[in-house]
Amino acid sequence: MMVKLGNVKLVTDILDQNGQQYSVYSDVTGEPTDKMVDAGLQIYKNEECDFLIGIGGGSPIDTMKAVAVVAAGDGSIDDYMGKRIRVRTPRMVAIPTTSGTGSEATQFTIITNTEKDIKMLLAGSGVMPDLAIDDPTFTMTAPKSVTAATGLDALCHASEAYTSRKRQLLTDEFALSAIKKIFEYLPICYNEPSNVKAVSYTHLTLPTKL
């Protein structure tokens, strides 16, 4: 989808202009799986890459983070399930095109084990991207269904932060601010996807609530 919409080309054009070599892996569809991670890792190793850029929703970014973990260590992604990832992973840049998952700003990634049909959680500082580029204009090309679903996802995250047992006065301020902005601007984003103000407020509430 990111290739079709031209979003990947926006990134590769910049790499070309700066003389950077790269390879593109664009076969992440739906929820990220161990097989997608293996395929991405194979390209990473074969092309002798040394950094990663993930662009898209939560699935491509989660896949990038998992590839980075295995690239920095040995074995397969299954070996890291439930473990704290503190190893120094390759540099990662996350460019989210949806507003709800928060994958670009968290120390977690979830990958499906296709053989056991379970979701594997990886967590730790090694899973955190080095840079997140939150450009609201990327969300303008998303289908309405994605805008609604990811917006509600962001609302759930903010509500969870506000009701958490570990909540603090500062996190309450962030969470309430995010909830108010989502209720105000998400309907506008849904009906007017090119409304820059509404899209910006909705997209940028994600870092605020975190």
What are these regions (language model features)?
Residues M1-F51:
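ATP/NTP phosphate-donor binding region
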Residues G40, T63-A68, A158-S159, I179-Y185:
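Buried hydrophobic packing segments
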Residues L52-D62:
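Glycine-rich phosphate-binding loop
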Residues P60-G73, A105:
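Short Gly/Thr/Asp-enriched flexible loops that form oxyanion-binding sites at enzyme active sites
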Residues A72-L170:
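A glycine/threonine-rich phosphate-anchoring loop and its flanking beta-alpha core
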Residues R167-I179:
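An accessory alpha-helical subdomain
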Residues A178-I179, F183-E192, V196-S200:
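A conserved active-site cap/scaffold subdomain adjacent to cofactor or substrate pockets
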Residues T202-T208:
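Conserved small/polar residues in nucleotide/adenosyl-binding loops
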